[in-house]
């Protein structure tokens, strides 16, 4: 047992040393903010306020859709969507990113995560209320769409609606 413990300790030390050296290497690769700004296209800098202004409606959408599912999903016995499965903000921890790049990564991780979260909530809502495919093909349907009934299949709709609703239950 002692030999196994020593080996585990050595492996732990090696992992710690590796992570420390990797972090140092990443820090050396980080571009300074002044250099980053000098090398940025002027339109990137000028458009930043407009891009970042979207955080307000995105945050409101996040809050509103979360409240919607907290209130409505239990009423219809639809399993709630776990927000943390969609909204992941972790890239700011990367040592090779400067402050501006970290803020950009936080924004994009949050915004795209919220949209994916909203898409899953609205996909479950559509499955409950109207699980019918559209007459024309969608470019990128949500994950529930393939289970929907064909457009114009009235008998299939009546038959499949209870089955699809049961599939959403907690």
For each predicted feature, which ranges?
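Short low-complexity stretches enriched in small and charged residues
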Residues: 23-27, 61-67, 84-88
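Residue-level signal for mature regions of secreted extracellular proteins and peptides
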Residues: 98-101, 123
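A transmembrane-helix-recognition feature enriched in membrane-embedded lipid enzymes
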Residues: 42-79
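N-terminal start-of-chain detector that recognizes signal peptides
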Residues: 78-81, 100-105
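Juxtamembrane inter-helical linkers in multi-pass membrane proteins
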Residues: 75-92
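Membrane-proximal intrinsically disordered regions of secretory-pathway and membrane-system proteins
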Residues: 1-40, 87, 93, 106, ...
């Amino acid at each position: 047992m002692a030999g196994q413990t020593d080996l585990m300790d050595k492996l732990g030390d090696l992992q710690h040393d590796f992570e420390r050296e990797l972090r140092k290497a990443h820090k050396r690769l980080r571009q300074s903010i002044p250099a980053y700004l000098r090398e940025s296209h002027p339109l990137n800098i000028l458009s930043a306020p407009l891009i970042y202004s979207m955080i307000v409606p995105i945050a409101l959408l996040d809050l509103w859709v979360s409240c919607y599912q907290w209130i409505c999903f239990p009423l219809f016995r639809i399993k709630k969507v776990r927000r943390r499965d969609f909204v992941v903000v972790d890239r700011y921890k990367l040592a090779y990113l400067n402050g501006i790049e970290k803020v950009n990564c936080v924004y994009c991780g949050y915004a795209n995560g919220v949209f994916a979260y909203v898409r899953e909530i609205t996909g479950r809502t559509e499955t409950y209320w109207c699980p019918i495919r559209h007459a024309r093909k969608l470019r990128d349907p949500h994950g529930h769409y393939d289970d929907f009934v064909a457009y114009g299949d009235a008998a299939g709709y009546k038959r499949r609606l209870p089955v699809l609703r049961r599939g959403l239950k907690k």
